Amino acid sequence: MACTIQKAEALDGAHLMQILWYDEEESLYPAVWLRDNCPCSDCYLDSAKARKLLVEALDVNIGIKGLIFDRKKVYITWPDEHYSEFQADWLKKRCFSKQARAKLQRELFFPECQYWGSELQLPTLDFEDVLRYDEHAYKWLSTLKKVGIVRLTGASDKPGEVSKLGKRMGFLYLTFYGHTWQVQDKIDANNVAYTTGKLSFHTDYPALHHPPGVQLLHCIKQTVTGGDSEIVDGFNVCQKLKKNNPQAFQILSSTFVDFTDIGVDYCDFSVQSKHKIIELDDKGQVVRINFNNATRDTIFDVPVERVQPFYAALKEFVDLMNSKESKFTFKMNPGDVITFDNWRLLHGRRSYEAGTEISRHLEGAYADWDVVMSRLRILRQRVENGN
C-alpha cells in the first residue's frame, strides 16, 4: 500500500504535483522535474536507460495542463499537448522529502562505515567461493565497503589470482606499474615497497590526482621472520585527531601537499599531484586519506610560516596511527589475498631479512571504486532477486 496513490493534484499554479499515498505520506514533485523525466520514447531511450530530452528544449517555467490518476499511475498532459505517464513506485522512490532522499542515497552508495582499531576481527572469506557464488561476492564487496578490508583465503601460490578478482569485479585499474605488479626485493628498486625495509603507514599512489580506490595483495611467498603487515583505519584515526587536536585536523584537511613519482616500469613516468592529506566532502565528512611519506615531494607550495605547523600536525596524525590502540598487525600466508580500501586504510610492513633468493613475494593490483561499486549494486540486485 505504500506505493499506492490515494490522491494526486496540481498545486502552486500547476507548477507542483502533490501525491497523497495510502500510507498517508505526502510527496511533492516540481512540474519541471516531471517534464524533464518524462519516460516516453521521445524523451527517454529505454535501451540505454538515458534521457533524450535536451535542456535546450525544456521550459523551466512549465506548468501542468491536465492530470488524472489511478492507484498505480499518474497521467499528465502538458501545455504543448505532450503526454507523460509515471508509475507510482517510480515516483515514491524519488520523493523529495528529506527522509526519502536519505533512504535512496543509502541504497545507492552503501555509506555504512564500521570503525575499528587494534580489536579488529579480520573479515575472512574463501577465495574460490567469491569467484563462484554471487552471495559470497556480495558479502565480500559489501564488507569491503563497510569495514574497509576483507581477507580471502584458499588462493593458489601462483601469480594471476588478483587478475581473477579483477574480472570478478569488472576490470583492474592500470597504473604506471602495470595491470598487476610484483612486491619483492629488487636491486635498484624503483619503489620503496620493492625493498626489505620497514614501510610506514601510507596510502598507495597519492601522486595521482585520482588515486586507486581498492588494493588487492596476494601472498605467493612469505618470509619466516619479519614481513608482518600492519593496517590502520584512517577514518577512525581522523575522528580521534579532530577530537584531540582540532587545529591539527584543520591544517591537514586544508593544506595542499605536493606528491611526486618519477621512474620507469610499465612505461616511463613523471607524475605530480596536489592533495589535502585529509580530504573532506561538502558536509565535513572524511572521504579519503592521501598520504605516502616516501612520495611526498620536497617541493612544498605553502608560505614559509605554515611549514612548521604543518609538520607538527602531520606528526600528531602519524603518532595516532602508530598507537597500539589504532593499528592491527597480522601476517599473510601463501594463498591469502588481502583486499582493502586504499582511500580509508593506511597500510605498512615490518622489515624482513634479505636472503640469497627472494624470500617474500606478493602480487598486487588496484581497482577503481566506481568499478567496485558498480559490481556491488549488480550483485545486491541478483542476490535479492534470487538469481
From Swiss-Prot:
<feature type="binding site">
    <location>
        <position position="82"/>
    </location>
    <ligand>
        <name>Zn(2+)</name>
    </ligand>
</feature>
<feature type="binding site">
    <location>
        <position position="40"/>
    </location>
    <ligand>
        <name>Zn(2+)</name>
    </ligand>
</feature>
<comment type="similarity">
    <text>Belongs to the gamma-BBH/TMLD family.</text>
</comment>
<comment type="pathway">
    <text>Amine and polyamine biosynthesis; carnitine biosynthesis.</text>
</comment>
<dbReference type="InterPro" id="IPR038492">
    <property type="entry name" value="GBBH-like_N_sf"/>
</dbReference>
<dbReference type="GO" id="GO:0045329">
    <property type="term" value="P:carnitine biosynthetic process"/>
</dbReference>
<keyword id="KW-0560">Oxidoreductase</keyword>
<dbReference type="InterPro" id="IPR012775">
    <property type="entry name" value="GBBH-like"/>
</dbReference>
<dbReference type="GO" id="GO:0042802">
    <property type="term" value="F:identical protein binding"/>
</dbReference>
<feature type="binding site">
    <location>
        <position position="202"/>
    </location>
    <ligand>
        <name>Fe cation</name>
    </ligand>
</feature>
<dbReference type="GO" id="GO:0005829">
    <property type="term" value="C:cytosol"/>
</dbReference>
<keyword id="KW-0862">Zinc</keyword>
<dbReference type="InterPro" id="IPR042098">
    <property type="entry name" value="TauD-like_sf"/>
</dbReference>
<keyword id="KW-0408">Iron</keyword>
<keyword id="KW-0479">Metal-binding</keyword>
<dbReference type="InterPro" id="IPR050411">
    <property type="entry name" value="AlphaKG_dependent_hydroxylases"/>
</dbReference>
<dbReference type="GO" id="GO:0005739">
    <property type="term" value="C:mitochondrion"/>
</dbReference>
<feature type="binding site">
    <location>
        <position position="347"/>
    </location>
    <ligand>
        <name>Fe cation</name>
    </ligand>
</feature>
<dbReference type="GO" id="GO:0070062">
    <property type="term" value="C:extracellular exosome"/>
</dbReference>
<feature type="binding site">
    <location>
        <position position="204"/>
    </location>
    <ligand>
        <name>Fe cation</name>
    </ligand>
</feature>
<dbReference type="Pfam" id="PF02668">
    <property type="entry name" value="TauD"/>
</dbReference>
<keyword id="KW-0124">Carnitine biosynthesis</keyword>
<dbReference type="InterPro" id="IPR003819">
    <property type="entry name" value="TauD/TfdA-like"/>
</dbReference>
<feature type="modified residue" description="Phosphoserine">
    <location>
        <position position="351"/>
    </location>
</feature>
<dbReference type="GO" id="GO:0008270">
    <property type="term" value="F:zinc ion binding"/>
</dbReference>
<keyword id="KW-0223">Dioxygenase</keyword>
<feature type="binding site">
    <location>
        <position position="43"/>
    </location>
    <ligand>
        <name>Zn(2+)</name>
    </ligand>
</feature>
<dbReference type="GO" id="GO:0005506">
    <property type="term" value="F:iron ion binding"/>
</dbReference>
<keyword id="KW-0597">Phosphoprotein</keyword>
<dbReference type="GO" id="GO:0008336">
    <property type="term" value="F:gamma-butyrobetaine dioxygenase activity"/>
</dbReference>
<dbReference type="Pfam" id="PF06155">
    <property type="entry name" value="GBBH-like_N"/>
</dbReference>
<feature type="binding site">
    <location>
        <position position="38"/>
    </location>
    <ligand>
        <name>Zn(2+)</name>
    </ligand>
</feature>
<dbReference type="InterPro" id="IPR010376">
    <property type="entry name" value="GBBH-like_N"/>
</dbReference>
<protein>
    <recommendedName>
        <fullName>Gamma-butyrobetaine dioxygenase</fullName>
        <ecNumber>1.14.11.1</ecNumber>
    </recommendedName>
</protein>
<keyword id="KW-0963">Cytoplasm</keyword>
<comment type="function">
    <text>Catalyzes the formation of L-carnitine from gamma-butyrobetaine.</text>
</comment>
